[in-house]
A protein has these predicted regions:
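Extreme N-terminal starter segment of soluble prokaryotic enzymes
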Residues: 1-5
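Short glycine-rich anion-binding loops that position phosphate/pyrophosphate groups of nucleotides
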Residues: 66-68, 147-148, 268
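Conserved N-proximal alpha/beta basic substrate-recognition cap immediately N-terminal to
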Residues: 9-120
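Short acidic-glycine loop/turn motifs at beta-strand connectors
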Residues: 26, 194-198, 255-257
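Phosphate-binding site of ATP-dependent enzymes
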Residues: 152-242
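ATP-dependent carboxylate activation and anion-phosphoryl transfer catalytic cores
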Residues: 229-295
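ATP-grasp fold ATP-binding core
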Residues: 108-112, 134-152, 175-185
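Rossmann-like NAD(P)H-binding beta-loop-alpha module
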Residues: 114-138
Length: 295
């Protein structure tokens, strides 16, 4: 029986959905917390283990959302995944793609380098520089944490005095300032789930009343949709730009330019709402992408 380990930050819906899919595929499924990772060097042939399972002896490793932690635990966890990957064990997503996509600045820069349209964005450490960029971006911006997802920590700033206070507060606590032009959109965005170089499911996310955000986690309403060829191509190319085999790609229709833009790419995407509205068994597809279809 094929065996995989899923590194998780809790045993919620996604873990149970993966367990169900694993049973249907005849896979021995081991979900373990990221904090259970153990690394060994020069230690009786051991390398990386989690809850007593050697990660260099399984058929695949699936990484889910990493829990918040300090710099040292995060670096160690990524080091351990790199070591497992270099041992030839399939990991979804590969560690480098996670490192790229979790960083909004780096991932957006690589997406732009791939020739894809992105929102004008400033990143820096100086509140004065950020305030200058605020004016250059039209005086209506979204301030985002450099790391983060699901619409959490986002602030829309549309007047100079508020911008100054927000930027100075972030500067005082040592945050990097990530300031993005607010895109005027029709009240919804698109989420494309890219797996193995193709879009396997997609949806529109309609924002809740009086909220410019569309994330389902904060009340957005999902609706199944078939993407047009342009949006589908953009989603696939954005995932490729950040080296992700699996990605949730967020796109917006820019009403001012008349063209869609890539907002961001998530290399650890959820699929609870997406699988519900599309009736696609995404968990099964994810496991098949990791270690191949049932044989």
């Amino acid at each position: 029986m094929r065996r995989i380990v899923a590194l998780v930050s809790g045993f919620g819906w996604h873990v149970e959905d993966l367990r169900r899919a694993a049973e249907s595929l005849g896979i021995d499924f081991h979900p373990v917390e990221f904090s259970a990772l153990r690394g060994y060097v020069g230690h009786l042939g051991k390398t990386v283990e989690a809850s007593g399972v050697s990660l260099t002896e399984v058929d695949g490793v699936l990484g889910r959302m990493m829990p918040p932690a300090g710099l040292e635990p995060v670096v160690f966890r990524m080091d351990a995944l790199h070591r497992v990957h270099r041992a030839g064990i399939p990991i979804l997503n590969p560690p480098r793609s996670v490192e790229i996509s979790v960083d909004k600045y780096l991932s957006l820069a690589l997406i732009e380098r791939a020739g894809l349209p992105v929102p004008p964005t400033f990143t820096g450490e100086s509140s004065a520089d950020a305030l200058e960029a605020f004016e250059q971006l039209g005086g209506d911006t979204i301030v985002k944490p450099l790391f983060g997802s699901e619409g959490r920590g986002l602030v829309r700033v549309s007047d100079r005095e508020t911008a100054r206070r927000v930027f100075q507060a972030l500067e005082r606590i040592g945050s990097v300032l990530y300031v993005q032009k607010a895109i005027r959109h029709p009240g919804f965005d698109y989420r494309a789930f890219v797996l193995g170089g193709r879009v396997v499911a997609s949806m529109k996310r309609h924002g809740p009343p009086a909220d410019w955000r569309t994330n389902v986690a904060i009340g957005g309403r999902p609706e199944a949709v078939t993407l047009d060829p342009l949006l589908e191509r953009m989603a696939v190319e954005a995932a490729r730009a950040v080296e992700a085999e699996m990605a949730g790609v967020d796109l917006l229709d820019d009403l001012d330019t008349g063209r869609p833009v890539i907002i961001e790419v998530n290399a650890v995407p959820g699929w609870k709402a997406l699988s519900k509205v599309t009736n696609v068994d995404i968990a099964k597809l994810v496991l098949e992408q990791l270690i191949g279809p049932q044989r």
